[in-house]
Swiss-Prot record:
Gene: tuf
Catalytic reaction equation(s): GTP + H2O = GDP + phosphate + H(+)
CDD domains in UniProt: EF_Tu, EFTU_II, EFTU_III
The protein's name in its UniProt record: Elongation factor Tu
Binding annotation for Mg(2+): T7
Subunit structure: Monomer.
Length: 382
């Protein structure tokens, strides 16, 4: 929630970790004056900091404004493997706290650790217990394991303002406890390269005498010559299976391509007309084509280059999914008349053609090539 101390905590973490030589200290105003970035056509003020514990290296993001947080979570500008929920003890959970927990659930943040801030302002230990209880209930209500989530108590400002260079100074204890909780409780994510193969197809070429080559950047997993793969999406037909007979990168032949590589894959028995941009090449059965899904969507304000007017159920924009635009119709929840620019809503979307989709997939909503919103798939409906 605004003023609960997210930015103070971020600065305090970099300070304490810098005493261990495991981070570069970043002052409050450096974080607060966050640079703007673009993600899926949306501008977001976002500050990245990094630090190292004994166990892991962390990339941590902080956003100055509430709207920036929402945009960051929905666009997935920063991939989140976990989150620190900062709550001011004297204030307790506030409406934005609920919204953040709900969004974290919707966009599939795997784990949350809580930092209960400003506890020095609480004289009554029973009140502190109540705030903690309320938080655990709130987390459970939105599908997180409220009973087992670590809640670390402390005062970020005291850690930030302390003159001490001794990492064992009492005012730093809460920050070290928090880092320990993050290390122990937030699971290590599976690396992209260890997940099933998937490459969004960006381009298709016919090569005389050799067959059809599809190019793109491998999103996850790996591919090697001889692998059986599927071509999924952009058609009502079942996915086609084929065999990769060559993998190339910058005109060089490779044994295999891995997540992050830009490659060309030569496909056996596939005509130039059988494949198109917007389809994906993937490990068989690893992703299915769908038309209908539920999504959490942020609609751009007019000042952000979005629409100037609301839209209603039945609105048919383009959905930019991975590499291409697909037309679809929007359905609003019961009782919701319309969506205003700047709103953050759950909606159902039905595309005119099935596309390779899974929960957690990010997309942009466009109108005549201009981004008017961003969303994340929260539930497949067909």
């Amino acid at each position: 929630h605004v003023d609960h101390g997210k930015t103070t905590l971020t600065a305090a973490i970099t300070k304490v970790m810098s005493l261990k030589g495991a981070a570069q200290f970043m002052a409050y105003d450096q974080i607060d004056n966050a640079p703007e970035e673009r993600a899926r056509g949306i501008t977001i003020a976002i500050r990245h900091v990094e630090y190292q514990t004994d166990k892991r290296h962390y990339a941590h993001v902080d956003c100055p404004g509430h709207a920036d947080y929402i945009k960051n979570m929905i666009t997935g500008a920063a991939q989140m493997d976990g989150a620190i929920l900062v709550v001011s003890a004297p204030d307790g959970p506030m409406p934005q706290t609920r919204e953040h927990i709900l969004l974290a659930r919707q966009v599939q943040v795997p784990a949350i650790v809580v930092f209960l801030n400003k506890v020095d302002m609480m004289d009554d230990p029973e009140l502190l217990e109540l705030v903690e209880l309320e938080l655990r209930e709130l987390l459970s209500k939105y599908g997180f394991p409220g009973d087992e989530i670590p809640i670390v108590r402390g005062t970020a400002r005291n850690a930030l303002e302390s003159p001490s260079k001794d990492i064992n100074a009492p005012e730093y204890k809460c920050i070290l406890e928090l880092m320990n909780a993050v290390d122990e409780y937030i699971p290590t994510p599976q690396r992209a390269v260890d997940q099933p193969f998937l490459m969004p197809i960006e381009d298709v070429f016919g090569i005389k005498g050799r067959g059809t080559v599809v190019t793109g950047r491998i999103e996850r997993g790996k591919v090697k010559v001889g692998d059986t793969v599927e071509i999924v999406g952009m058609t009502n037909d079942a996915p086609r299976r084929t065999v990769v007979t060559g993998v190339e990168m910058f005109q060089k032949t490779l044994d295999e391509g891995i997540a992050g590589d830009n490659v060309g894959c030569l496909l056996r028995g596939i005509e130039r007309t059988d494949v198109e941009r917007g389809q994906v090449l993937c490990a068989p059965g690893s992703i299915k084509p769908h038309k209908k899904f539920e999504a959490q969507v942020y609609v751009l304000k007019k000042e952000e280059g979005g629409r100037h007017t609301p839209f209603f159920s039945g609105y048919r924009p383009q959905f930019y999914i991975r590499t291409t635009d697909v037309t679809g119709a929007i359905g609003l929840p019961a009782g919701m008349e319309m969506v205003m620019p700047g709103d953050n809503v759950v909606m159902t979307i039905e595309l005119i053609v099935p596309v390779a989709i899974e929960e957690g997939l990010r997309f942009a909503i466009r109108e005549g090539g201009r981004t008017v919103g961003a969303g994340v798939v929260t539930k497949i409906l067909d």
